[in-house]
Protein backbone atom coordinates (compact mmCIF):
# COMPACT_ATOMS: atom_id res chain seq x y z
CA UNK A 1 0.00 0.00 0.00
CA UNK A 2 1.04 3.59 -0.45
CA UNK A 3 1.85 4.62 3.10
CA UNK A 4 1.94 8.22 4.22
CA UNK A 5 5.09 9.27 6.09
CA UNK A 6 4.52 9.09 9.84
CA UNK A 7 1.14 7.35 9.50
CA UNK A 8 0.11 4.21 11.39
CA UNK A 9 -1.79 1.30 9.88
CA UNK A 10 -3.71 -1.85 10.84
CA UNK A 11 -3.43 -5.08 8.86
CA UNK A 12 -6.01 -7.84 9.19
CA UNK A 13 -6.43 -11.18 7.43
CA UNK A 14 -9.78 -12.93 7.69
CA UNK A 15 -11.64 -15.93 6.27
CA UNK A 16 -15.35 -15.12 5.86
CA UNK A 17 -16.14 -18.71 4.82
CA UNK A 18 -15.87 -20.62 8.12
CA UNK A 19 -16.68 -23.43 8.36
CA UNK A 20 -17.80 -23.24 4.70
CA UNK A 21 -19.08 -20.71 2.20
CA UNK A 22 -22.48 -22.46 2.24
CA UNK A 23 -22.69 -22.35 6.05
CA UNK A 24 -20.52 -19.49 7.38
CA UNK A 25 -21.76 -19.68 10.98
CA UNK A 26 -18.34 -18.66 12.38
CA UNK A 27 -17.85 -15.74 9.95
CA UNK A 28 -15.26 -14.18 10.12
CA UNK A 29 -12.23 -16.16 11.32
CA UNK A 30 -9.30 -13.82 11.74
CA UNK A 31 -5.95 -15.27 10.78
CA UNK A 32 -3.76 -12.26 11.52
CA UNK A 33 -4.15 -8.87 13.20
CA UNK A 34 -1.44 -6.23 13.54
CA UNK A 35 -1.94 -2.65 14.74
CA UNK A 36 0.28 0.44 14.89
CA UNK A 37 2.29 -0.45 11.78
CA UNK A 38 4.61 2.42 10.90
CA UNK A 39 4.27 3.04 7.17
CA UNK A 40 4.75 -0.26 5.32
CA UNK A 41 7.04 -1.79 7.96
CA UNK A 42 4.76 -4.63 9.11
CA UNK A 43 7.38 -5.87 11.60
CA UNK A 44 7.14 -2.52 13.44
CA UNK A 45 3.52 -3.15 14.42
CA UNK A 46 1.97 -4.70 17.51
CA UNK A 47 0.74 -8.24 16.82
CA UNK A 48 -2.66 -8.84 18.44
CA UNK A 49 -3.15 -12.22 16.73
CA UNK A 50 -0.28 -14.30 15.38
CA UNK A 51 -0.43 -15.37 11.75
CA UNK A 52 -2.24 -18.62 10.98
CA UNK A 53 -2.00 -19.65 7.34
CA UNK A 54 -4.82 -20.90 5.17
CA UNK A 55 -5.93 -24.49 5.63
CA UNK A 56 -9.54 -25.17 4.71
CA UNK A 57 -10.88 -28.44 6.15
CA UNK A 58 -11.73 -31.28 3.78
CA UNK A 59 -15.15 -30.99 2.17
CA UNK A 60 -15.65 -27.26 2.85
CA UNK A 61 -14.97 -26.02 -0.68
CA UNK A 62 -13.26 -22.77 -1.56
CA UNK A 63 -12.46 -20.29 1.20
CA UNK A 64 -11.69 -16.62 0.62
CA UNK A 65 -8.75 -15.18 2.55
CA UNK A 66 -9.00 -11.41 2.71
CA UNK A 67 -6.24 -8.95 3.62
CA UNK A 68 -7.29 -5.40 4.54
CA UNK A 69 -5.17 -2.40 5.50
CA UNK A 70 -6.61 0.55 7.41
CA UNK A 71 -5.00 3.90 8.09
CA UNK A 72 -5.28 4.68 11.80
CA UNK A 73 -6.24 8.15 13.07
CA UNK A 74 -3.55 7.71 15.76
CA UNK A 75 -1.94 5.05 17.91
CA UNK A 76 -4.25 2.27 19.13
CA UNK A 77 -3.69 1.62 22.82
CA UNK A 78 -6.46 -0.96 23.33
CA UNK A 79 -4.73 -4.25 22.56
CA UNK A 80 -7.84 -6.44 22.83
CA UNK A 81 -8.89 -7.96 19.52
CA UNK A 82 -12.28 -9.11 20.71
CA UNK A 83 -11.66 -12.61 22.02
CA UNK A 84 -11.89 -15.71 19.90
CA UNK A 85 -10.68 -15.87 16.34
CA UNK A 86 -14.07 -17.10 15.16
CA UNK A 87 -16.96 -14.66 14.72
CA UNK A 88 -14.51 -11.77 14.47
CA UNK A 89 -16.12 -8.79 12.79
CA UNK A 90 -13.56 -6.68 10.98
CA UNK A 91 -16.14 -3.91 10.51
CA UNK A 92 -16.79 -3.82 14.26
CA UNK A 93 -13.06 -3.60 14.96
CA UNK A 94 -12.66 -0.83 12.38
CA UNK A 95 -15.61 1.11 13.79
CA UNK A 96 -14.40 0.72 17.40
CA UNK A 97 -11.04 2.24 16.47
CA UNK A 98 -12.41 4.83 14.00
CA UNK A 99 -10.44 3.34 11.10
CA UNK A 100 -12.84 4.27 8.31
CA UNK A 101 -12.66 2.41 5.02
CA UNK A 102 -9.70 0.21 4.06
CA UNK A 103 -6.92 1.94 2.13
CA UNK A 104 -5.76 -1.34 0.57
CA UNK A 105 -6.90 -4.91 0.22
CA UNK A 106 -6.33 -8.18 -1.53
CA UNK A 107 -7.56 -11.75 -1.35
CA UNK A 108 -6.93 -15.28 -2.50
CA UNK A 109 -8.99 -18.45 -2.53
CA UNK A 110 -7.91 -21.88 -1.33
CA UNK A 111 -9.45 -25.29 -0.84
CA UNK A 112 -8.41 -28.50 0.86
CA UNK A 113 -6.01 -30.56 -1.24
CA UNK A 114 -7.24 -34.15 -1.40
Swiss-Prot record:
InterPro entries: PEBP, PEBP-like_sf, PEBP_euk, Phosphatidylethanolamine-bd_CS. It comes from the Eukaryota. Belongs to the phosphatidylethanolamine-binding protein family. This is Protein D2.
